[in-house]
């Protein structure tokens, strides 16, 4: 069995319901299928087909199912619309159309009877009535039985009320027969009724007293001029217009009747003013039986009473004749029975119009049914017009009768008539005064409230004695209430408010404030979020600085970048031993005189109370910022409470790229020395894409590299990377893994640009060879197959020669450093020579001058890139003489060369061993120039650097000249917590890269060099460890 998507069950008996897929259907399923009869077409196996009717207004096909066994194309509803089957009609209770059918034995076209047919062809014998008005020609049985006034309180006889639905037609026939007999009797005695004797009488049963009292409720109650009909002694006597009064139909009479019981065949009293001889419940009274005084006064009084009743009835229950029509009343059969004929006619006409529009395009619509509907409408309309005509004629005759009765009473009993007229006028005046009083109450009066002891001049609200401002003084009113808002001082707002929809009504002023407040919440949130970005310019404390989440960029070094064609002067940097700076003119915020422990108490308390993981908003600075010291240069924003750095990921990436770029430049400068020492021709290295940078002894020193090295390096040098980002960068001594490095302070050659308030100095150092012991053999593995010779042992210079070359190199570099420091004024830019990119495959040297007498040139194969071997002694110790309380970080830093991991990632992608030196300026001015020297080293072992040829290292002797510099005590905050995951692989970076906060700057020119020798396939022979 196929099922839809919605599988659900009944909450009553837990039986499965229709599983219609598009929407949830709660109908019962058909037996054997998972759908109801409405949605069974979703199951293609069901024996049903779809209706073929297509709507014209939306071109959608009908979705009703049709059994396949039936030979038809449309469902039942559209068969009716198309006119193939008759439409179902709701059978109304005591439908007058059915009575017409029974009475006249008409077929379905009986509704097309025209007005002449209804007036002249009726079989009830009324065709020849000449004295009755035109309205009397309407079929009485049709107008009198069902289409009556809704306020007539008509009730059928007991036999009709108790009759069942099956006996309705039979009862209707019996009632019609009785009415025909009555009409025949009326025609027989019509001449006697209009005879001169003033003794006409009217049949009036006792149960019709209340029915006849308001019968003559017209504009003027009629009164018989000659006599009256009196009832038997039990009921009160009433009089009705008799002679000379044109009869009116019983339908209009029932509009005023209040009785609960009346015989159905009873003729209208105005139509039947004659005496019915067989009746014994009525007494015929002649005018001579009473005195003239009694008859005239009593008749007039009765007319006055009827007039009063008529006025009350019209005042209270005036919506007769269709004026109380309601659309809802036509929907239910019970209400439709009480509707007036014209209401029914109007509703039928509207229905007919709607059906005309709906079926204009329907050619199969039955013409007979449309003709029938149209005739029904005209018939109802004709009946309504007849009622209006009868009512108007009756009003005229009633006024005439009243005038006659008043004239007769005044002529015979003037005093009594005068008193009666006075009473009528008094009653009319009282009614007029009451209406005027009501009008006065509606008129606005002055407010009864007082303002500062004076009467309020405003007009009062309708039906009140107070204006809008003082309406709350009226405690009985329920519409107005006081504003529920309060002012800032706690005073309750007393403005009246007309608000019946809210629990807490607000006056106009407070309502606007509330709306603005609610709207401002969202706008303020948006504004705060937009203002957070500009606020970053004002360097908030590190605790409140949010780490910016940004997609990490990959390595920015392309495979083959194109060097810039135009020299960039601002990006140049000399490849000298160090870059000095005049510390007397530049004060670095990275060496603050105010430490974390020396903070004011209030700031320290604030920092202690704020947790690290709490995100602060801008509003939280209102209490913290006023407490900060005035001199913010002494306050390090990048240092936390415990000295922990809180840098961002961007800072780490910029630092890493800068270090790699600086190391590449240093390696390039080192290549020049090694190439000259190993005897490789300069031209060959240039052809292989390796620039040789050399400087003779008589030259000014190693020439500075002036081409654009890297975008990040240029930004670092020119201040586009804010120097404060690196003001607190200090490496943990644990990163070097139990190694000792001693860095004596050296003078800083050159000057930093003026835009660096206190930047980190970048020193590009070349190889410095200082050694007093024999230089061991250095061999490259056999893959260096492009060397000049397999062994070249004879061409290899003596170690003593290497030492002499190293001494000359040191002397030349120091000379260059001193010269360059004097040539560059304070705040000047670097030299703008073009520096080739370290990432380029082809690097040419702007200076091809080689050292005089240098035989240290090396030849390398094109397949193997040049790798600068950094000579890192196992233990380098240089005492910091004269330093007050020297820290271990700068005094003794052990470097264990047995562990190759610290240097594993010092190789760049192009094969160069990366080495950098960053230094911060010292706090004191140093005028002396000292040589960087290494301490005596006792190498315990030598290890093979990963990715490098096996190399033997030799220790170097210390220099005799050391400079002692005094400086305040340093505090090195931990850097590994922030940069450990990124710089752990770069732990081979010398300690001079660690910027200091408040002590002597690390040596600017700490140099490590790589000494290479040519060998074909010899492995490294480690040095013996001297004890």
From Swiss-Prot:
Superkingdom of source: Eukaryota
Skewed-composition ranges (Basic residues): 525-559
Compositional bias ranges of the Polar residues kind: 229-257, 937-954
UniProt lineage: Eukaryota, Metazoa, Chordata, Craniata, Vertebrata
Function: Putative regulatory component of the chromatin remodeling INO80 complex which is involved in transcriptional regulation, DNA replication and probably DNA repair.
Keywords from the UniProt entry: DNA damage, DNA recombination, DNA repair, Isopeptide bond, Nucleus, Phosphoprotein, Transcription, Transcription regulation, Ubl conjugation
GO terms (BP aspect): chromatin remodeling; DNA recombination; DNA repair; positive regulation of DNA repair; positive regulation of DNA-templated transcription; positive regulation of telomere maintenance in response to DNA damage; regulation of cell cycle; regulation of chromosome organization
Subcellular location(s) per record: Nucleus
Keyword DNA-binding on entry: no
Spans annotated as Disordered: 193-278, 519-574, 813-850, 914-969, 982-1027
One CC-aspect GO term: Ino80 complex
Annotated family: Belongs to the INO80D family.
Source organism (scientific name): Homo sapiens (Human)
Record protein name field: INO80 complex subunit D
Positions bearing Phosphoserine: 132
Composition bias type Low complexity, residue spans: 201-216, 914-932, 1001-1027
Disulfide bond is among the record's keywords: no
Subunit: Component of the chromatin remodeling INO80 complex; specifically part of a complex module associated with the N-terminus of INO80.
Glycyl lysine isopeptide (Lys-Gly) (interchain with G-Cter in SUMO2) cross-link, renumbered residues: 87
